[in-house]
Amino acid sequence: MSILNGPRLNFWGGIRTDVSLPNNSPTIPYDGNDDWPLFDLTTSTLAPGAEPYTDDQLNNMINAPTGNYYTAGGWNHYGQHVVDMQNALISSQGEPGSITTTGDLVGQAVYLLGSVDPVTGQGPVSGPMMVDLDPTASTTTQIFVGGLQIGGNDNIQLLIRSNTVCSSFDVAGRVLLPKKMDAPGSFHASGTFQLTFPLSSIVSWNQNSSGLRSIIQAPGATGIVLRFVMFEMCPTMTTEQLDADYAAGKYTPNPSIGRVIGTLAPAFADEPLNCQPGRQLVNQSTGNAGYADLDNTGYLSIDMVNVIPKETFRAVRDDITSPIGPNADYGTVTISAGSTTLTTLEPTSRYLFDYYVYGGIVDLPLTADQLQAVRTSALAITAPGKVAGTTLQATESTYRIYADQRNVYLEDYPNGLSITLQVRYLGGAVPSATEIGLQAAAPAVYDQPQYWDFLDFPDSLTVGSGELSVSFPVTLKPGSAAQAGFVALTCTANGLDSSAYFTNFRKYAQTDFGIPQGTTITWPLMYPNVLRFHYLAFPAMSRYIPLNQPDAIMGAKNPILARTSDAYKGTTLFMPVVRSMSPCQRALLRAYLTGEPWQPPQ
Protein backbone atom coordinates (compact mmCIF):
# COMPACT_ATOMS: atom_id res chain seq x y z
CA MET A 1 0.00 0.00 0.00
CA SER A 2 1.51 3.30 -1.11
CA ILE A 3 5.09 3.53 0.23
CA LEU A 4 4.39 0.64 2.62
CA ASN A 5 4.40 -3.08 1.88
CA GLY A 6 6.05 -3.03 -1.51
CA PRO A 7 9.09 -2.11 -3.59
CA ARG A 8 10.53 1.29 -2.84
CA LEU A 9 13.36 3.74 -3.42
CA ASN A 10 14.43 5.76 -0.38
CA PHE A 11 16.35 9.03 -0.46
CA TRP A 12 17.52 11.83 1.82
CA GLY A 13 19.27 15.18 1.48
CA GLY A 14 18.59 18.89 1.75
CA ILE A 15 15.69 21.07 0.63
CA ARG A 16 15.02 24.80 0.19
CA THR A 17 11.69 26.66 0.19
CA ASP A 18 12.00 30.27 -0.93
CA VAL A 19 8.68 31.69 0.27
CA SER A 20 7.90 35.38 0.74
CA LEU A 21 6.59 36.29 4.20
CA PRO A 22 4.77 39.65 4.37
CA ASN A 23 1.47 38.09 3.27
CA ASN A 24 1.49 35.79 6.32
CA SER A 25 -0.01 38.58 8.41
CA PRO A 26 -2.34 41.48 7.59
CA THR A 27 -0.42 43.69 10.02
CA ILE A 28 3.13 44.83 10.72
CA PRO A 29 4.71 46.61 13.69
CA TYR A 30 4.90 50.31 12.84
CA ASP A 31 5.04 53.58 14.74
CA GLY A 32 4.47 52.01 18.16
CA ASN A 33 1.59 49.85 16.96
CA ASP A 34 2.48 46.14 16.89
CA ASP A 35 -0.54 45.43 14.69
CA TRP A 36 -0.62 48.25 12.17
CA PRO A 37 -3.01 47.16 9.36
CA LEU A 38 -1.13 46.79 6.06
CA PHE A 39 -3.08 44.29 3.94
CA ASP A 40 -6.50 42.79 3.51
CA LEU A 41 -5.41 39.24 2.74
CA THR A 42 -8.92 38.06 1.91
CA THR A 43 -9.10 40.40 -1.11
CA SER A 44 -5.35 40.81 -1.82
CA THR A 45 -5.50 44.57 -1.47
CA LEU A 46 -4.10 47.17 0.91
CA ALA A 47 -5.76 48.05 4.19
CA PRO A 48 -7.47 51.46 3.93
CA GLY A 49 -5.02 53.08 6.35
CA ALA A 50 -2.05 51.99 4.23
CA GLU A 51 -3.36 53.30 0.92
CA PRO A 52 -2.16 56.93 1.32
CA TYR A 53 1.47 55.86 1.74
CA THR A 54 3.74 55.53 -1.28
CA ASP A 55 5.05 52.17 -2.42
CA ASP A 56 8.57 53.15 -1.34
CA GLN A 57 7.35 54.15 2.11
CA LEU A 58 5.49 50.87 2.56
CA ASN A 59 8.44 48.80 1.34
CA ASN A 60 10.69 50.56 3.84
CA MET A 61 8.17 49.87 6.60
CA ILE A 62 8.02 46.17 5.65
CA ASN A 63 11.83 45.90 5.58
CA ALA A 64 12.43 47.82 8.81
CA PRO A 65 14.38 45.85 11.46
CA THR A 66 12.40 44.91 14.54
CA GLY A 67 15.50 44.76 16.73
CA ASN A 68 15.42 41.10 17.75
CA TYR A 69 13.59 39.11 15.08
CA TYR A 70 14.21 39.86 11.43
CA THR A 71 12.06 42.64 9.93
CA ALA A 72 8.53 43.96 10.24
CA GLY A 73 7.64 41.85 7.21
CA GLY A 74 9.31 38.69 8.47
CA TRP A 75 12.39 36.71 7.52
CA ASN A 76 12.06 36.75 3.72
CA HIS A 77 10.55 39.52 1.60
CA TYR A 78 12.16 38.59 -1.72
CA GLY A 79 11.39 34.90 -2.08
CA GLN A 80 10.27 33.45 -5.40
CA HIS A 81 8.37 30.54 -3.77
CA VAL A 82 10.53 27.94 -5.53
CA VAL A 83 11.12 24.59 -3.81
CA ASP A 84 14.25 22.64 -4.71
CA MET A 85 16.02 19.62 -3.33
CA GLN A 86 19.72 19.86 -2.53
CA ASN A 87 21.85 16.75 -3.05
CA ALA A 88 18.89 14.49 -2.31
CA LEU A 89 20.27 11.07 -3.24
CA ILE A 90 18.76 7.59 -3.27
CA SER A 91 20.21 5.74 -0.27
CA SER A 92 18.44 2.36 -0.34
CA GLN A 93 16.02 0.29 -2.39
CA GLY A 94 14.24 -3.03 -2.41
CA GLU A 95 11.25 -4.87 -0.96
CA PRO A 96 10.20 -5.37 2.68
CA GLY A 97 12.70 -7.73 4.22
CA SER A 98 15.34 -7.05 1.58
CA ILE A 99 16.03 -3.32 1.55
CA THR A 100 19.63 -2.76 0.47
CA THR A 101 22.03 0.18 0.34
CA THR A 102 23.76 -1.20 -2.77
CA GLY A 103 20.97 -1.21 -5.36
CA ASP A 104 21.35 -0.06 -8.97
CA LEU A 105 19.85 3.38 -8.26
CA VAL A 106 21.64 4.11 -4.99
CA GLY A 107 23.50 7.41 -5.33
CA GLN A 108 21.20 8.82 -8.03
CA ALA A 109 19.75 12.28 -7.40
CA VAL A 110 16.03 12.96 -7.02
CA TYR A 111 14.55 16.22 -8.33
CA LEU A 112 11.11 17.78 -8.25
CA LEU A 113 10.46 19.71 -11.46
CA GLY A 114 8.51 22.78 -12.51
CA SER A 115 5.95 22.75 -15.29
CA VAL A 116 6.52 22.65 -19.01
CA ASP A 117 4.78 25.63 -20.63
CA PRO A 118 1.31 24.24 -21.50
CA VAL A 119 1.05 26.41 -24.62
CA THR A 120 4.56 26.49 -26.08
CA GLY A 121 5.81 23.18 -24.71
CA GLN A 122 9.04 24.85 -23.61
CA GLY A 123 10.82 24.52 -20.30
CA PRO A 124 10.60 23.98 -17.47
CA VAL A 125 12.25 27.30 -16.67
CA SER A 126 11.50 27.28 -12.94
CA GLY A 127 10.86 24.79 -10.19
CA PRO A 128 7.97 23.68 -7.99
CA MET A 129 6.13 26.46 -6.16
CA MET A 130 5.14 26.54 -2.48
CA VAL A 131 1.79 28.27 -2.04
CA ASP A 132 -0.40 28.93 0.99
CA LEU A 133 -4.13 28.72 0.31
CA ASP A 134 -4.66 30.58 3.59
CA PRO A 135 -1.49 32.64 4.12
CA THR A 136 -2.43 33.35 7.75
CA ALA A 137 -2.63 29.65 8.70
CA SER A 138 0.21 27.51 10.03
CA THR A 139 -1.39 24.08 9.65
CA THR A 140 -0.92 23.33 5.96
CA THR A 141 0.69 24.58 2.77
CA GLN A 142 0.87 23.34 -0.83
CA ILE A 143 3.54 22.64 -3.42
CA PHE A 144 2.60 22.84 -7.09
CA VAL A 145 4.80 20.46 -9.08
CA GLY A 146 5.37 19.81 -12.79
CA GLY A 147 7.18 16.50 -12.63
CA LEU A 148 9.92 14.31 -11.21
CA GLN A 149 13.39 13.29 -12.33
CA ILE A 150 15.82 10.66 -11.08
CA GLY A 151 19.40 11.08 -12.24
CA GLY A 152 21.24 14.10 -13.62
CA ASN A 153 20.47 15.61 -17.01
CA ASP A 154 23.31 13.62 -18.56
CA ASN A 155 22.10 10.34 -17.05
CA ILE A 156 18.32 10.47 -16.62
CA GLN A 157 16.96 7.28 -15.09
CA LEU A 158 13.33 8.41 -14.82
CA LEU A 159 11.56 11.48 -16.22
CA ILE A 160 7.95 12.32 -15.38
CA ARG A 161 5.97 15.31 -16.65
CA SER A 162 2.73 15.84 -14.75
CA ASN A 163 1.15 18.94 -13.26
CA THR A 164 -0.09 18.19 -9.79
CA VAL A 165 -0.18 19.61 -6.29
CA CYS A 166 0.57 18.20 -2.87
CA SER A 167 -0.38 19.53 0.55
CA SER A 168 1.39 19.26 3.87
CA PHE A 169 0.15 16.88 6.54
CA ASP A 170 1.34 16.22 10.08
CA VAL A 171 2.69 19.73 10.62
CA ALA A 172 3.77 18.99 14.17
CA GLY A 173 6.76 18.68 16.48
CA ARG A 174 9.85 17.03 15.01
CA VAL A 175 12.85 18.70 16.74
CA LEU A 176 12.89 19.13 20.53
CA LEU A 177 15.81 21.48 21.21
CA PRO A 178 16.70 24.26 21.48
CA LYS A 179 13.50 25.73 22.83
CA LYS A 180 14.21 28.91 20.87
CA MET A 181 16.57 29.96 18.09
CA ASP A 182 16.90 32.78 15.57
CA ALA A 183 14.16 31.35 13.38
CA PRO A 184 10.37 31.07 13.28
CA GLY A 185 8.89 28.58 15.73
CA SER A 186 8.31 26.19 12.84
CA PHE A 187 11.96 25.11 13.14
CA HIS A 188 10.57 22.58 15.64
CA ALA A 189 8.12 21.15 13.09
CA SER A 190 7.97 18.92 10.05
CA GLY A 191 5.65 18.73 7.07
CA THR A 192 4.78 15.55 5.17
CA PHE A 193 3.85 15.71 1.48
CA GLN A 194 2.62 13.04 -0.91
CA LEU A 195 2.40 13.20 -4.72
CA THR A 196 1.00 10.64 -7.13
CA PHE A 197 2.04 10.56 -10.78
CA PRO A 198 0.06 8.36 -13.22
CA LEU A 199 2.09 5.84 -15.23
CA SER A 200 0.95 7.67 -18.37
CA SER A 201 2.99 10.71 -17.28
CA ILE A 202 6.30 8.85 -17.59
CA VAL A 203 8.26 10.39 -20.46
CA SER A 204 11.22 8.01 -20.25
CA TRP A 205 12.79 5.50 -17.91
CA ASN A 206 15.73 3.14 -17.77
CA GLN A 207 14.14 -0.24 -18.39
CA ASN A 208 17.38 -1.95 -17.40
CA SER A 209 16.97 -0.67 -13.83
CA SER A 210 15.68 -3.39 -11.53
CA GLY A 211 14.69 -0.75 -8.99
CA LEU A 212 12.49 1.10 -11.47
CA ARG A 213 11.08 -2.09 -12.98
CA SER A 214 9.94 -3.26 -9.55
CA ILE A 215 7.91 -0.08 -9.12
CA ILE A 216 6.67 0.72 -12.62
CA GLN A 217 5.81 -2.89 -13.46
CA ALA A 218 4.40 -3.81 -10.04
CA PRO A 219 1.22 -5.87 -10.58
CA GLY A 220 -1.81 -3.59 -10.59
CA ALA A 221 0.20 -0.37 -10.25
CA THR A 222 -1.44 2.72 -11.74
CA GLY A 223 1.28 5.24 -10.95
CA ILE A 224 4.25 6.26 -8.86
CA VAL A 225 3.79 7.75 -5.41
CA LEU A 226 6.30 10.00 -3.70
CA ARG A 227 6.17 10.71 0.04
CA PHE A 228 8.66 13.18 1.45
CA VAL A 229 9.11 14.85 4.81
CA MET A 230 10.87 18.17 5.32
CA PHE A 231 12.04 19.17 8.78
CA GLU A 232 14.78 21.00 10.65
CA MET A 233 13.85 24.04 8.54
CA CYS A 234 15.15 27.54 9.26
CA PRO A 235 15.93 30.72 7.29
CA THR A 236 19.37 30.69 5.67
CA MET A 237 20.34 34.05 7.16
CA THR A 238 20.12 35.09 10.79
CA THR A 239 18.39 38.29 11.85
CA GLU A 240 21.72 40.11 11.98
CA GLN A 241 22.71 38.91 8.51
CA LEU A 242 19.35 39.78 6.94
CA ASP A 243 19.22 43.24 8.49
CA ALA A 244 22.74 43.94 7.22
CA ASP A 245 21.79 42.68 3.75
CA TYR A 246 18.76 44.98 3.56
CA ALA A 247 20.72 47.91 4.99
CA ALA A 248 23.24 47.45 2.17
CA GLY A 249 20.43 47.54 -0.39
CA LYS A 250 21.02 43.96 -1.56
CA TYR A 251 17.56 42.55 -0.76
CA THR A 252 18.77 38.97 -1.10
CA PRO A 253 16.23 36.13 -0.92
CA ASN A 254 16.41 34.26 2.39
CA PRO A 255 14.98 30.79 1.74
CA SER A 256 14.16 28.35 4.49
CA ILE A 257 16.56 25.41 4.36
CA GLY A 258 16.47 22.00 5.98
CA ARG A 259 16.34 18.26 5.63
CA VAL A 260 14.28 15.98 3.42
CA ILE A 261 13.63 12.24 3.70
CA GLY A 262 11.60 10.58 0.97
CA THR A 263 10.36 7.37 -0.59
CA LEU A 264 9.15 6.42 -4.08
CA ALA A 265 6.88 3.42 -4.58
CA PRO A 266 4.10 2.07 -6.82
CA ALA A 267 0.68 3.70 -6.51
CA PHE A 268 -2.60 1.81 -6.80
CA ALA A 269 -6.10 2.83 -7.81
CA ASP A 270 -7.73 2.43 -4.40
CA GLU A 271 -5.26 4.72 -2.59
CA PRO A 272 -5.45 8.44 -1.82
CA LEU A 273 -3.43 10.64 -4.14
CA ASN A 274 -1.97 13.11 -1.67
CA CYS A 275 -2.15 11.74 1.84
CA GLN A 276 -0.82 8.55 3.33
CA PRO A 277 -3.19 5.62 3.73
CA GLY A 278 -2.86 3.14 6.53
CA ARG A 279 -3.25 3.10 10.29
CA GLN A 280 -2.18 6.29 12.04
CA LEU A 281 -0.07 6.33 15.21
CA VAL A 282 0.28 9.67 16.97
CA ASN A 283 3.14 10.60 19.29
CA GLN A 284 1.34 11.88 22.39
CA SER A 285 4.18 14.30 23.27
CA THR A 286 4.82 15.91 19.87
CA GLY A 287 1.54 15.36 18.05
CA ASN A 288 3.38 13.98 15.02
CA ALA A 289 2.30 10.80 13.30
CA GLY A 290 3.39 7.56 11.70
CA TYR A 291 1.50 5.14 9.45
CA ALA A 292 1.31 1.36 9.36
CA ASP A 293 -0.14 -1.30 7.10
CA LEU A 294 -0.18 -5.09 6.78
CA ASP A 295 0.69 -6.74 3.48
CA ASN A 296 -0.41 -10.13 2.21
CA THR A 297 2.86 -11.85 3.07
CA GLY A 298 2.86 -11.28 6.82
CA TYR A 299 4.84 -8.04 7.00
CA LEU A 300 3.76 -4.99 8.96
CA SER A 301 5.36 -1.87 7.50
CA ILE A 302 5.49 1.31 9.58
CA ASP A 303 6.47 4.76 8.35
CA MET A 304 8.28 6.02 11.46
CA VAL A 305 9.99 9.13 10.03
CA ASN A 306 8.05 11.43 12.35
CA VAL A 307 7.19 9.09 15.23
CA ILE A 308 10.44 9.70 17.12
CA PRO A 309 11.63 13.34 17.21
CA LYS A 310 15.18 14.53 16.70
CA GLU A 311 16.62 15.77 19.97
CA THR A 312 18.63 18.78 18.77
CA PHE A 313 18.63 20.99 15.69
CA ARG A 314 21.69 20.56 13.46
CA ALA A 315 24.84 22.29 14.71
CA VAL A 316 25.70 24.14 11.49
CA ARG A 317 22.82 26.27 10.25
CA ASP A 318 23.54 26.07 6.52
CA ASP A 319 24.72 22.44 6.44
CA ILE A 320 21.73 20.56 5.08
CA THR A 321 23.47 17.75 3.18
CA SER A 322 25.66 16.06 5.80
CA PRO A 323 24.31 12.91 7.52
CA ILE A 324 21.13 13.70 9.43
CA GLY A 325 22.04 11.56 12.42
CA PRO A 326 19.81 9.52 14.72
CA ASN A 327 16.61 10.64 16.35
CA ALA A 328 16.29 11.07 20.11
CA ASP A 329 17.36 8.10 22.24
CA TYR A 330 14.47 7.03 24.49
CA GLY A 331 16.01 3.61 25.10
CA THR A 332 14.73 0.32 23.73
CA VAL A 333 11.72 0.93 21.48
CA THR A 334 8.85 -1.56 21.71
CA ILE A 335 6.30 -1.94 18.91
CA SER A 336 3.13 -3.71 20.03
CA ALA A 337 -0.45 -4.54 19.11
CA GLY A 338 -2.59 -4.49 22.21
CA SER A 339 -0.74 -6.60 24.79
CA THR A 340 1.28 -8.45 22.13
CA THR A 341 4.87 -7.34 21.53
CA LEU A 342 5.73 -7.34 17.83
CA THR A 343 9.40 -6.40 18.14
CA THR A 344 11.90 -4.37 20.12
CA LEU A 345 14.48 -2.06 18.56
CA GLU A 346 17.69 -1.02 20.27
CA PRO A 347 18.94 2.56 19.74
CA THR A 348 21.83 1.11 17.71
CA SER A 349 19.44 -0.66 15.33
CA ARG A 350 19.72 0.54 11.74
CA TYR A 351 15.98 1.28 11.84
CA LEU A 352 16.66 3.88 14.54
CA PHE A 353 20.28 5.01 14.20
CA ASP A 354 20.31 5.22 10.38
CA TYR A 355 16.54 5.52 9.94
CA TYR A 356 16.79 8.20 7.24
CA VAL A 357 18.84 5.91 4.99
CA TYR A 358 15.85 3.56 4.87
CA GLY A 359 13.14 6.17 4.38
CA GLY A 360 12.22 5.93 8.05
CA ILE A 361 10.25 2.77 7.25
CA VAL A 362 10.38 -0.33 9.46
CA ASP A 363 9.30 -3.71 8.03
CA LEU A 364 8.34 -6.33 10.61
CA PRO A 365 7.80 -10.03 9.77
CA LEU A 366 4.98 -11.34 11.96
CA THR A 367 4.02 -14.71 13.37
CA ALA A 368 0.44 -15.98 13.07
CA ASP A 369 -0.35 -14.87 16.63
CA GLN A 370 1.15 -11.44 15.99
CA LEU A 371 -0.85 -11.11 12.77
CA GLN A 372 -4.05 -11.80 14.65
CA ALA A 373 -3.15 -9.23 17.30
CA VAL A 374 -2.40 -6.58 14.66
CA ARG A 375 -5.73 -7.21 12.94
CA THR A 376 -7.75 -6.84 16.14
CA SER A 377 -5.81 -4.47 18.41
CA ALA A 378 -4.49 -0.93 18.42
CA LEU A 379 -0.83 -0.46 17.59
CA ALA A 380 1.61 1.36 19.85
CA ILE A 381 5.26 2.43 19.83
CA THR A 382 6.78 3.06 23.26
CA ALA A 383 10.10 3.40 25.06
CA PRO A 384 11.05 3.87 28.74
CA GLY A 385 13.26 6.96 28.61
CA LYS A 386 12.74 10.72 28.71
CA VAL A 387 14.33 13.27 26.37
CA ALA A 388 13.97 17.03 26.81
CA GLY A 389 10.98 16.46 29.07
CA THR A 390 9.18 14.24 26.55
CA THR A 391 8.34 10.54 26.53
CA LEU A 392 7.80 8.22 23.59
CA GLN A 393 4.27 6.95 23.50
CA ALA A 394 2.79 6.76 20.02
CA THR A 395 -0.68 5.25 20.02
CA GLU A 396 -3.00 4.35 17.19
CA SER A 397 -6.00 6.50 16.38
CA THR A 398 -8.49 3.63 16.25
CA TYR A 399 -10.76 5.63 13.94
CA ARG A 400 -9.16 7.56 11.11
CA ILE A 401 -10.64 9.87 8.46
CA TYR A 402 -8.75 11.03 5.38
CA ALA A 403 -9.50 12.40 1.91
CA ASP A 404 -7.85 13.70 -1.23
CA GLN A 405 -9.13 17.24 -0.75
CA ARG A 406 -6.86 19.24 1.55
CA ASN A 407 -6.76 22.73 -0.02
CA VAL A 408 -9.67 23.78 -2.23
CA TYR A 409 -10.09 26.97 -4.25
CA LEU A 410 -13.84 27.39 -4.60
CA GLU A 411 -13.49 29.26 -7.91
CA ASP A 412 -12.58 25.87 -9.41
CA TYR A 413 -15.98 24.49 -8.36
CA PRO A 414 -18.64 27.06 -9.35
CA ASN A 415 -21.39 24.47 -8.84
CA GLY A 416 -19.95 23.07 -5.63
CA LEU A 417 -18.06 19.83 -5.09
CA SER A 418 -18.39 16.42 -3.52
CA ILE A 419 -15.87 15.27 -0.92
CA THR A 420 -15.37 11.58 -0.31
CA LEU A 421 -14.11 10.70 3.15
CA GLN A 422 -12.25 7.47 3.73
CA VAL A 423 -13.19 6.17 7.19
CA ARG A 424 -11.26 3.38 8.88
CA TYR A 425 -11.31 1.44 12.12
CA LEU A 426 -7.99 -0.29 12.88
CA GLY A 427 -7.20 0.08 9.19
CA GLY A 428 -10.38 -1.63 7.96
CA ALA A 429 -14.08 -1.01 7.57
CA VAL A 430 -16.00 0.39 10.52
CA PRO A 431 -17.52 -2.44 12.61
CA SER A 432 -20.74 -0.56 13.35
CA ALA A 433 -22.64 2.52 12.20
CA THR A 434 -20.32 5.47 12.71
CA GLU A 435 -21.33 9.12 12.91
CA ILE A 436 -19.16 11.69 11.17
CA GLY A 437 -19.49 15.21 12.53
CA LEU A 438 -18.69 18.20 10.30
CA GLN A 439 -17.71 21.59 11.70
CA ALA A 440 -16.56 24.80 9.99
CA ALA A 441 -13.91 26.70 11.93
CA ALA A 442 -12.87 30.31 11.62
CA PRO A 443 -9.22 31.04 10.83
CA ALA A 444 -7.17 32.55 13.63
CA VAL A 445 -6.90 36.00 12.03
CA TYR A 446 -10.06 36.53 9.99
CA ASP A 447 -12.47 35.16 12.57
CA GLN A 448 -15.54 37.30 11.87
CA PRO A 449 -18.34 35.33 10.13
CA GLN A 450 -18.18 37.45 6.97
CA TYR A 451 -14.71 35.99 6.31
CA TRP A 452 -15.50 32.29 6.81
CA ASP A 453 -19.23 31.57 7.02
CA PHE A 454 -20.01 30.92 3.35
CA LEU A 455 -20.31 27.12 2.99
CA ASP A 456 -23.34 24.86 2.97
CA PHE A 457 -22.69 21.28 4.07
CA PRO A 458 -24.45 18.65 6.20
CA ASP A 459 -23.92 18.73 9.97
CA SER A 460 -23.35 14.99 10.16
CA LEU A 461 -23.06 11.83 8.09
CA THR A 462 -23.37 8.13 8.87
CA VAL A 463 -21.00 5.44 7.66
CA GLY A 464 -22.76 2.09 7.70
CA SER A 465 -21.30 -1.02 9.29
CA GLY A 466 -18.73 -2.62 7.00
CA GLU A 467 -18.35 0.48 4.83
CA LEU A 468 -15.13 2.32 4.02
CA SER A 469 -16.23 5.73 2.78
CA VAL A 470 -18.94 8.35 2.64
CA SER A 471 -19.42 11.37 0.37
CA PHE A 472 -21.06 14.71 0.98
CA PRO A 473 -21.71 17.91 -1.00
CA VAL A 474 -20.16 21.31 -0.32
CA THR A 475 -21.75 24.37 -1.93
CA LEU A 476 -21.72 28.11 -1.45
CA LYS A 477 -24.44 29.67 0.65
CA PRO A 478 -26.95 31.79 -1.26
CA GLY A 479 -26.03 35.47 -1.11
CA SER A 480 -22.34 34.82 -0.39
CA ALA A 481 -20.98 36.10 -3.72
CA ALA A 482 -19.43 39.25 -2.21
CA GLN A 483 -17.71 37.39 0.63
CA ALA A 484 -13.99 36.61 0.57
CA GLY A 485 -12.03 34.56 3.05
CA PHE A 486 -10.86 31.21 4.34
CA VAL A 487 -12.44 28.37 6.28
CA ALA A 488 -11.39 24.95 7.55
CA LEU A 489 -13.97 22.16 7.53
CA THR A 490 -13.13 19.50 10.11
CA CYS A 491 -14.60 15.99 10.13
CA THR A 492 -14.49 13.65 13.14
CA ALA A 493 -15.66 10.07 13.71
CA ASN A 494 -17.85 9.37 16.75
CA GLY A 495 -16.71 12.65 18.29
CA LEU A 496 -13.09 11.49 18.61
CA ASP A 497 -10.62 14.31 18.03
CA SER A 498 -7.92 11.74 17.27
CA SER A 499 -9.82 10.74 14.12
CA ALA A 500 -10.09 14.26 12.71
CA TYR A 501 -9.34 15.41 9.17
CA PHE A 502 -9.71 18.92 7.78
CA THR A 503 -10.04 20.56 4.38
CA ASN A 504 -9.17 24.22 3.83
CA PHE A 505 -11.24 26.36 1.47
CA ARG A 506 -10.55 29.75 -0.06
CA LYS A 507 -13.31 31.91 -1.49
CA TYR A 508 -12.68 34.96 -3.64
CA ALA A 509 -15.08 37.88 -3.74
CA GLN A 510 -17.38 38.54 -6.67
CA THR A 511 -17.01 42.30 -7.23
CA ASP A 512 -16.98 45.02 -9.87
CA PHE A 513 -14.64 47.17 -7.71
CA GLY A 514 -17.23 49.95 -7.92
CA ILE A 515 -16.32 50.48 -11.57
CA PRO A 516 -19.30 50.86 -13.95
CA GLN A 517 -19.63 48.19 -16.61
CA GLY A 518 -18.28 49.34 -19.97
CA THR A 519 -15.61 51.61 -18.46
CA THR A 520 -12.21 51.71 -20.18
CA ILE A 521 -9.81 50.58 -17.47
CA THR A 522 -6.90 52.90 -16.74
CA TRP A 523 -3.84 52.40 -14.54
CA PRO A 524 -5.34 54.32 -11.56
CA LEU A 525 -8.37 52.00 -11.69
CA MET A 526 -6.39 48.77 -12.02
CA TYR A 527 -3.20 49.20 -9.97
CA PRO A 528 -4.66 49.71 -6.45
CA ASN A 529 -7.23 46.95 -7.02
CA VAL A 530 -4.90 44.31 -8.46
CA LEU A 531 -1.15 44.80 -8.70
CA ARG A 532 -0.29 47.04 -5.76
CA PHE A 533 -0.72 44.31 -3.17
CA HIS A 534 1.37 41.92 -5.26
CA TYR A 535 4.10 44.50 -5.82
CA LEU A 536 4.46 45.01 -2.07
CA ALA A 537 3.93 41.46 -0.81
CA PHE A 538 5.89 39.67 -3.55
CA PRO A 539 8.62 42.01 -4.82
CA ALA A 540 10.52 39.13 -6.43
CA MET A 541 7.90 39.23 -9.19
CA SER A 542 9.13 42.69 -10.11
CA ARG A 543 12.59 41.36 -10.90
CA TYR A 544 10.99 40.05 -14.07
CA ILE A 545 8.28 42.66 -14.68
CA PRO A 546 8.16 45.78 -12.44
CA LEU A 547 4.57 45.53 -11.24
CA ASN A 548 4.34 49.23 -10.31
CA GLN A 549 5.39 50.61 -13.71
CA PRO A 550 2.62 51.02 -16.32
CA ASP A 551 4.99 50.93 -19.30
CA ALA A 552 6.61 47.72 -18.09
CA ILE A 553 3.25 46.06 -17.52
CA MET A 554 1.97 47.07 -20.94
CA GLY A 555 5.26 45.97 -22.49
CA ALA A 556 4.75 42.52 -21.01
CA LYS A 557 1.11 42.43 -22.07
CA ASN A 558 1.21 39.16 -23.99
CA PRO A 559 3.03 37.02 -21.41
CA ILE A 560 0.84 38.43 -18.62
CA LEU A 561 -2.34 37.68 -20.57
CA ALA A 562 -1.07 34.17 -21.21
CA ARG A 563 0.11 33.42 -17.68
CA THR A 564 -3.14 34.65 -16.08
CA SER A 565 -5.29 32.54 -18.41
CA ASP A 566 -6.98 29.28 -17.47
CA ALA A 567 -4.54 27.36 -19.69
CA TYR A 568 -1.85 27.89 -17.04
CA LYS A 569 -3.99 27.02 -14.04
CA GLY A 570 -2.65 24.02 -12.18
CA THR A 571 0.89 24.65 -13.42
CA THR A 572 3.86 26.20 -11.65
CA LEU A 573 3.71 29.04 -14.22
CA PHE A 574 0.27 30.46 -13.35
CA MET A 575 0.42 34.17 -12.51
CA PRO A 576 0.73 34.98 -9.75
CA VAL A 577 2.30 31.74 -8.58
CA VAL A 578 0.94 32.40 -5.09
CA ARG A 579 -2.65 32.22 -6.43
CA SER A 580 -3.73 35.27 -4.49
CA MET A 581 -5.37 37.04 -7.45
CA SER A 582 -9.12 36.53 -7.67
CA PRO A 583 -10.97 35.90 -10.96
CA CYS A 584 -12.32 39.44 -10.77
CA GLN A 585 -8.83 40.86 -10.26
CA ARG A 586 -7.51 38.88 -13.21
CA ALA A 587 -10.42 40.16 -15.31
CA LEU A 588 -9.67 43.77 -14.33
CA LEU A 589 -6.01 43.31 -15.22
CA ARG A 590 -6.94 41.79 -18.57
CA ALA A 591 -9.33 44.65 -19.31
CA TYR A 592 -6.53 47.13 -18.61
CA LEU A 593 -4.10 45.27 -20.89
CA THR A 594 -6.52 44.71 -23.78
CA GLY A 595 -8.45 47.98 -23.63
CA GLU A 596 -11.71 46.03 -23.73
CA PRO A 597 -14.66 47.62 -21.90
CA TRP A 598 -14.92 46.47 -18.29
CA GLN A 599 -17.11 43.43 -17.83
CA PRO A 600 -16.83 41.79 -14.39
CA PRO A 601 -17.03 37.98 -14.50
CA GLN A 602 -20.25 36.44 -13.27
What are these regions (language model features)?
Residues 1-602:
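Aromatic- and Gly/Pro-enriched helix-to-coil junctions and flexible linker segments
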